[in-house]
Amino acid sequence: QGVVWVGCLPKTAGLRLPEGANKSIALAFFKELGDYAYSRGTVIGMEPNPPIYNTNYINDTESAFDLIKKVDSKGFLLNLDLGTMIQNEEDVGELTGRVSLISHVHISEPGLKPIEERAIHSELKDLLKKEGYDRFISIEMGKTNDIGILENAMAYVRRFSDDL
């Protein structure tokens, strides 16, 4: 089962740090935030965004994992974004042994274009299944006036996630 949100405004904001910013401040901030979230039975999801979104901090999945490891909080996990992985040409193998650090999976495309059927989706599904992932999988896509595009994306992701 899952929840479908239609017509929501984007909730993801890329990070753009000023030149020379003290990144260690982020560690303490995210640690406090993550620990608080965990104490309340939830998590904060760190989603990397590639530079195509005008970001310069946490631009790939590996740097997000590095930050999550440094923050070291059960309430600060990865929001895995397939659009980022596709844009950066990242390999699903990078996730091996770290699926427990994923709080949420976005099936998406670079630029939030309509979802395309891709081999990376079945590779990810196999890894998530193997490592016992049991959390949310959702579609992240830009606005469309063509309901058929949305229906196709939902049917595709349902096939993908029902097999987990």
What are these language model-derived features?
Residues 27, 31-32, 39, 58-164:
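Histidine-acidic metal/acid-base catalytic patches
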